[in-house]
């Protein structure tokens, strides 16, 4: 009898203990510092920062190392001979402009998609940011996963390049509609607020950017799919939200608490200089914009000149590059996403193709 009574007592004690342990099970097993109900506005900031890379390593690996092939900048570090300027970059470096956007966009994108049930202004905004970011991937690599990318899918079909650009144009057009309508209907409400480092939450500015990006995409595909390009360009210039057409409209990305990555690479690391190609062109034409773009050389006897560094020299020493001109950025300089000058140029190019994009060619140029 005592045996049974003892067993019953022990069993009851265990039940009481189990009950006390599970009373606060959710509390004990919940990270109080984690965001549980996805707030689309909070998730948006890091997505926006991918359209022009703020993070210093992302900027260097993509915009600076690969970007020097455009002839504007020149990397002044040989990285032991493994670099883009001598066409000897590693496979890992080749993959960075692909991997980084996918890694940094889709985590937050899927959370916003789920939180909004793929509807509304937040979702339209997220689709626009994805479109702007992935445009660069499509330009670099061609066919890629886009329209079929879904949460939880480890194997995704590639879209053709035509499908990618068409989907990007569709996302931009929808964003221009949704964001501008929201802006008008709410009397200028800015739901992103401080989470927007470009327009401080002003959806009117973002709608203009979406339309201006449609012009950019249209021009890039005009030689291959002229029909799609013309339709997109003409729709963009007639959209009620308008375009980025004055410097006050310019889309400029604030670096916030981070240093401007170009200034950091040039001044703190000594890894970036101005490219000789762009300096030679601008010197030849007496271009008055040079002081806005470059700092003058510190080379002996040339401190009154802009002197660019030549790409492709495999034998130079980093110390030899110290005196060449550097980009005229400060630590707090904003990064340009899109400016009115590009809109004017794209319109002029459209007029040359016979598109109905407003403005006369000479005026646009």
Where are these regions (language model features)?
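General helical structural elements
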Residues: 6-10, 28, 134, 218
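Residues that line or immediately flank small-molecule/substrate-binding pockets and catalytic motifs
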Residues: 8, 12, 51, 297
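Sec-dependent bacterial lipoprotein signal peptides
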Residues: 1-19
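Structured, solvent-exposed acidic/aromatic patches
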Residues: 37-41, 74-365
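Membrane-proximal, proline-rich intrinsically disordered regions
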Residues: 21-74, 80, 92, 111, ...
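Generic secretory/membrane-interface signal
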Residues: 13-17, 21, 281, 336
């Amino acid at each position: 009898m005592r045996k049974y009574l003892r067993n019953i007592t022990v069993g009851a004690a265990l039940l009481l203990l189990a009950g006390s342990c599970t009373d606060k099970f959710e509390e004990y097993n919940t990270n109080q510092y984690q965001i549980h109900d996805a707030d689309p506005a909070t998730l948006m900031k890091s997505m926006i920062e991918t359209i022009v890379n703020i993070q210093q390593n992302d900027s260097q690996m993509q915009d600076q190392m690969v970007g020097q092939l455009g002839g504007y900048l020149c990397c002044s570090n040989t990285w032991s001979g493994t670099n883009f300027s001598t066409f000897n970059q590693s496979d890992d470096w080749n993959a960075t402009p692909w991997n980084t956007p996918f890694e940094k966009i889709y985590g937050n994108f899927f959370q916003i998609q789920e939180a909004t049930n793929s509807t509304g202004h937040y979702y339209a905004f997220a689709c626009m940011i994805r479109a702007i970011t992935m445009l660069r991937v499509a330009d670099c690599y061609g066919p890629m996963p886009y329209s079929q990318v879904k949460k939880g899918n480890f194997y995704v079909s590639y879209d053709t390049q035509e499908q990618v650009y068409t989907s990007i144009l569709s996302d931009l057009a929808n964003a221009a509609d949704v964001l501008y309508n929201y802006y008008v209907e709410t009397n200028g409400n800015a739901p992103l607020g401080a989470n927007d480092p470009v327009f401080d939450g002003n959806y009117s500015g973002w709608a203009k950017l979406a339309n201006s990006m449609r012009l950019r995409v249209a021009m890039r595909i005009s030689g291959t799919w002229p029909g799609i390009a013309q339709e997109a360009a003409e729709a963009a210039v007639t959209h009620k939200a308008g375009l980025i057409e004055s410097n006050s409209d310019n889309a400029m990305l604030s670096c916030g608490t981070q240093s401007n990555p170009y200034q950091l690479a040039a001044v703190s690391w000594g890894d970036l200089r101005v490219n000789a190609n762009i300096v030679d062109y601008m010197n030849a034409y007496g271009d008055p914009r040079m002081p806005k773009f470059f700092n003058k050389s510190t080379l002996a006897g040339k401190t009154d000149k802009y002197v660019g560094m030549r790409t492709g020299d495999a034998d130079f020493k980093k110390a030899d590059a110290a005196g060449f001109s550097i980009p005229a950025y400060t630590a707090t300089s904003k990064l340009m996403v899109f400016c009115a000058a590009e809109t004017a140029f794209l319109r002029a190019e459209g007029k040359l193709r016979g598109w109905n994009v407003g403005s006369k060619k000479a005026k646009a140029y």
